[in-house]
A protein has these predicted regions:
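An alpha-helical, amphipathic repeat domain used for nucleic-acid recognition
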Residues: 1-148
Length: 148
């Protein structure tokens, strides 16, 4: 049997892509960037390999978006921050919006949990403290309505 290094370039790229996908879900954009970086001399072959993986349902931006949204919610990120992170990873804007909308998360409750984790359950005693907490929640991706 041939070693992976001796395989034809297309099989070598597919093998590396499968290794990456076995560890975690990747967006097509992420996977393409990693494969082109690993195999710059075979960059034109990466597109067809990715198309085959998508056709075989081994790579899915939908699955990646769902898994990534769950992970970011678990880390206490709000919808704006999640949307931005998905777009940075090459997920289509409409798919990002759809995935966040389908997510059954109470953003108000999550904002409260995040604030209590950071600041405890002590109420704000000054305007400056309230502004500090609001900025923190905005940084985490919550909108003004969810912060109130």
């Amino acid at each position: 049997m041939k070693k992976p290094d001796e395989l034809d370039p297309q099989r070598l790229i597919r093998h590396r892509a499968m290794d990456l996908l076995a560890r975690r879900e990747h967006s097509a954009h992420e996977l393409q960037a990693k494969l082109v970086e690993k195999f710059p001399e075979h960059a034109p072959l990466v597109g067809p390999v990715l198309a085959g993986l998508t056709r075989d349902n081994l790579q899915s931006d939908q699955r990646f978006a769902e898994a990534y949204v769950c992970a970011l919610i678990h880390r206490g990120q709000g919808p704006y921050r999640i949307r931005q992170a998905l777009q940075q990873r090459g997920v289509d804007t409409s798919l990002a919006e759809q995935t966040i909308a389908v997510c059954d998360e109470d953003w108000f409750e999550l904002a409260v949990q995040v604030m209590h984790k950071k600041y405890g359950r002590q109420p704000c005693t000054s305007f400056a403290e309230r502004a500090r907490r609001s900025r923190f929640l905005q940084y985490r991706g919550f909108n003004a309505e969810q912060i109130q």
